[in-house]
């Protein structure tokens, strides 16, 4: 059996981590395409093959161009992929093969929502990129929620849900004081963690308003694009992210929509209580291991107080829920899936 895990994204990004996990779980090679200027400084270890697209365009960051012109830009790689099953770990990649038995992961469909930044209006580029891959027979989805969204969209092929585990570096350390010392965080505050991009659906205004309600006893720790009056971090390696999780008292994740909810799963693995939105995807991923609320400031603030007062209980629930997303289950699911694809195709 020969499978190639094809990915893109900055080092330590969610997309990078996703392709790395599938490659590590299966032992199959990973190829990372550097397709935009923000990936120029990303580098990987010797176990990952890196192929550069055109990163010197004066009129573009390169991403759209390298997808649309991928068959030309990556023509050498295209030849090498002909004898393998290719797992495209995002549809934001150039389509380099014509094998309907290849695999694509669809992480979300938010670009179909007119309220989302990715919605293309008259011409939806993301939808155009997606449709190229829906000629495949097989799709991997990160959650049952996204599987349902794909079915509603009209995809009639085989959709398999494979839950991602927390990164191996994310674990409970049982030493909050030491974690705070290592990350330069105060010991005299209750620390609320916010970790996300700045997309509208991440609902960051609610995070800011919630902190104002909570008052001076609390301090916001922010991983991602900065928020005013927070202790801000960006570009952290997984080991540092783990220190942040272990240093904080609660994760506030008032999202309006997710394909999976990686920070929630990571919080469970690190023993951090979670306050998140009472929406379909969070009911699937978190269930009663988190406090689910309407994502408005007043209810978030109340839930944060409850979660900190009941820290032990929610830590215990989180650890129990983590079994659903265990590394052992993930490795088994990945290898079972790749083996079935190989047997069906004869590759």
Where does each model-flagged region fall?
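Carbohydrate transferase catalytic cores enriched for Leloir-type hexosyltransferases
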Residues: 1-347
